[in-house]
Structures are given as structure tokens and as C-alpha cells.
């Protein structure tokens, strides 16, 4: 098996660049993000393709502008035929999505992601049954177990791929999408 770089994408709602120490902030304490930035690639000139949630996620996962990816506003699913980075990666990669999806049915693995844990269920909104999002079974399970939904990536979670949990050298790509608290 060819060794490739492991990829981790972290989405957080309403995250401004100037709230992180790696960009000069010295009063908001984010020790884990600081540590990650010290051992990772930190972008100096990154731009969001669209400031709205769904189109921004579509842009990041596909590499396309919103008008090319499909979702141009919230509550528009990513077209089934639209490929994401998970579908372009070599087969050696293990791919995972954890957290908010907002690009269609949150309940099922799709677009090349092999491991899938969603904290929300927007399917009823996408098919017009409701205007309010509901919480996924996974979200409700986390709450019942005493976790907050944003703890889906903690090391003690049983559904994490073993390669991520044990930090083995296999090739993996993880998207972690967190909600605003």
C-alpha cells in the first residue's frame, strides 16, 4: 500500500481567523487547536467560497464554486453526481465524515465517505416535510450517554475508524463538522 498524507478537515460554525493563536490571537485559549496548528499546514491566504453553511461545505468538499457544485443557498442538496474529495482520493484512503453534513440527507453515508456519523438529520427539510432540523439518532445517543454532539471525535467513541483512534499510519481522510455552541 502506498503511504499518502493523512488529511483532516475541521469545520466550525462562525470561526474567524483572528480567533486562533496561529493567526496572532493571544487572549482566546484554544490549546488543542494551537497544538494542531504547530504540527500542521496553516493557510495564510484562504478564502471562503460562500459565507453560507451549505454552499461553503459544498465548495470545500468538491473544490468547486457554489454555482458549479450545486448548492448556492442553504437547504439545497449536493447533486448525487457531484464528486467530493473523498471520491477522488486513491482507494487506499479510508474516508470519514463526522458531525453536520447539510448537503442533503444527513443520515446515510454518501459521496465517497465510508464512515459516517451525523449529529443532525435534515432529511425532512430537504423533502419539504418540515422547516426545522431534527436531531439524528446518533445525536440523541450521544446526549443519552452524557456527551455533547460535538464530542463525536473524542478518542473514546466506539464508531471511529480504528486507524484514526489508534493513530496507525494507514491512509485516512476525516472531515469533522461542528456546530455553534
Residues covered by each model-derived region:
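Formylglycine-dependent sulfatase
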Residues: 1-181
Amino acid at each position: 500500500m502506498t503511504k499518502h498524507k493523512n488529511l483532516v478537515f475541521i469545520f466550525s460554525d462562525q470561526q474567524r481567523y483572528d480567533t486562533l493563536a496561529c493567526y496572532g490571537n493571544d487572549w482566546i485559549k484554544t490549546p488543542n487547536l494551537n497544538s494542531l496548528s504547530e504540527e500542521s499546514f496553516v493557510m495564510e491566504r484562504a478564502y471562503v467560497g460562500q459565507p453560507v453553511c451549505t454552499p461553503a461545505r459544498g465548495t470545500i468538499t468538491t473544490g468547486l464554486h457554489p454555482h458549479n457544485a450545486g448548492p448556492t443557498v442553504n437547504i439545497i442538496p449536493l447533486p448525487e453526481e457531484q464528486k467530493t474529495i473523498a471520491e477522488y482520493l486513491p482507494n487506499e484512503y479510508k474516508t470519514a465524515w463526522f458531525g453536520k453534513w447539510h448537503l442533503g440527507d444527513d443520515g446515510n453515508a454518501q459521496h465517497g465517505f465510508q464512515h459516517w456519523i451525523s449529529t443532525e438529520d435534515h432529511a425532512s427539510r430537504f423533502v419539504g416535510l418540515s422547516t426545522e432540523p431534527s436531531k439524528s439518532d446518533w445525536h440523541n445517543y450521544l446526549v443519552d450517554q452524557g456527551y455533547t454532539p460535538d464530542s463525536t471525535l473524542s478518542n473514546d467513541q466506539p464508531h471511529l475508524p480504528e486507524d484514526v483512534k489508534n493513530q496507525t499510519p494507514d491512509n485516512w481522510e476525516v472531515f469533522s463538522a461542528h456546530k455553534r455552541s
